[in-house]
Amino acid sequence: MDAIKKKMQAMKLEKDNAMDRALLCEQQARDANLRAEKAEEEARSLQKKTQQIENDLDQTMEQLMQVNAKLDEKDKALQNAESEVAALNRRIQLLEEDLERSEERLATATAKLAEASQADDESERARKILESKGLADEERMDALENQLKEARFMAEEADKKYDEVARKLAMVEADLERAEERAESGESKIVELEEELRVVGNNLKSLEVSEEKANLREEEYKQQIKTLTTRLKEAEARAEFAERSVQKLQKEVDRLEDELVHEKEKYKFICDDLDMTFTELVGY
């Protein structure tokens, strides 16, 4: 009988232990379910966050492609401006060559004037001799008239050449104005690109990268932004250089115009002197 009681007590104790283990297992199962639900929720949150990061990265890549396209357009515009500046330099060189040739013709006309003056002196001496002898030297007068006609013809040709130079200078001024307008347009595009780069930088800073692949892509984008910033600074420097070149060309055009006015005044003086000399010779 005692053995049965002991056995019953042992079975009861084993039952109580089994109940305790069952309760513990149930609690562990509930805890495991809670952890599983929490893990699933974290996984969904992480997946949603990763999808958002992918979308932001795709949007950033599209913005970077647009910035690259706009920078390429800016490079083409700057190259066109540089080509126009080179063309203006060539035109200035041609104008300088024309001016040199005009100066050579002016020197020739001046030499002719000196010869005419010398011939006039000789004619004066001959006139006095002829007055004393009562003879007229018609051949000398014809030669002087021919020289005066030739000098006048050269002066007229020089005037025509200077008119052509003035017309070319007007064309150069128009080209300079167009180059300045393109330089101003380039500066406004640079400001727009700076604003877009700032927006891209802010978007990149707001991204939370949780995976190694996302970290690597973020570093690549930062490097691209650094490269784009460097190219933007280079574009700004090239735009400033183009503006300085335009200003330099404008100063050169002003100098050529001043020389043109000066040379016309010299030609006018020579023509007046030739007319006066011819009048004096005819009066004799």
From Swiss-Prot:
Gene3D superfamilies: 1.20.5.170, 1.20.5.340
GO BP annotations listed: regulation of muscle contraction
Segments forming a coiled coil: 1-266
Highest rank taxon of the organism: Eukaryota
Pfam family, one: Tropomyosin
Free-text function comment from the UniProt entry: Tropomyosin, in association with the troponin complex, plays a central role in the calcium dependent regulation of muscle contraction.
This protein's name: Tropomyosin Per a 7.0103
Upper lineage: Eukaryota, Metazoa, Ecdysozoa, Arthropoda, Hexapoda
